[in-house]
Amino acid sequence: MKILKYIITIFILFSSSVFANGDPDTFLKDSVKEISTFISENKESLDSDENFLRSKVDELVIPKLDIELMSKIVLGKKNWTSMSIPERKEFQLAFRGLMVRTYMKSLTSFDGEKIEFLPYKKGKRNDVARVKSVYLLKEGELHVNYSLKMNQSGGWKVYDINIDGISLLRNYRSDFKSHIEREGIRSLINELQSN
């Protein structure tokens, strides 16, 4: 799934320890240089050492995702509210594992592509933002929108990435919904945990 590769690669470029207070577009822009430099300087280790790769995904990417909000969205309100609190926690942990594995597969695919940010327009809500960009590839352009939500401490976390109209979370939600309808939530959690 080529688009998923780009979604992941693009997000990784913007994941950084400075992803905190301030305008979300500023932090996304500042992160590009830091992460692309890290990837360039550590390409061999990222390619050859799975433990190093996993630790970098845990350090650079996962803390920047709003796993709880993502979990609610991919399951849908009905499924989320039907689960007990321990089941929700278990699902979040399994979904987090899926994110780690997914980003591990794509971290090394960055090849110096350029990204241009469109002018940021603040929305009606101060706690939600959408940052638009264009990812310049050899094959053409990809339009990328980042959906972010401000957490309780005032930092921003990404909860969805949309590339050329395709939402990462909508894709997962569609897959998960089909699985839940066929086999139930417990089966989905078990499958996420076993991969």
Regions found by a protein language model. Name each.
Residues 95, 121, 135-137, 148-150, ...:
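A mature extracytoplasmic/lumenal domain signature
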Residues 160-195:
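Low-complexity, intrinsically disordered terminal/linker segments enriched in charged
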Residues 143-170:
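Short beta-strand edge/turn micro-motifs at domain boundaries
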Residues 101-142, 195:
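Surface-exposed, charged secondary-structure patches
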Residues 23-103:
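Early exported N-terminus immediately downstream of N-terminal targeting peptides
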Residues 46-47, 51-53, 57-59, 64-66, ...:
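Short leucine-rich amphipathic alpha-helices used at interfaces
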Residues 4-15:
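Sec-dependent N-terminal signal peptides
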Residues 16-20:
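Sec/Tat signal peptide C-region and signal peptidase I cleavage site
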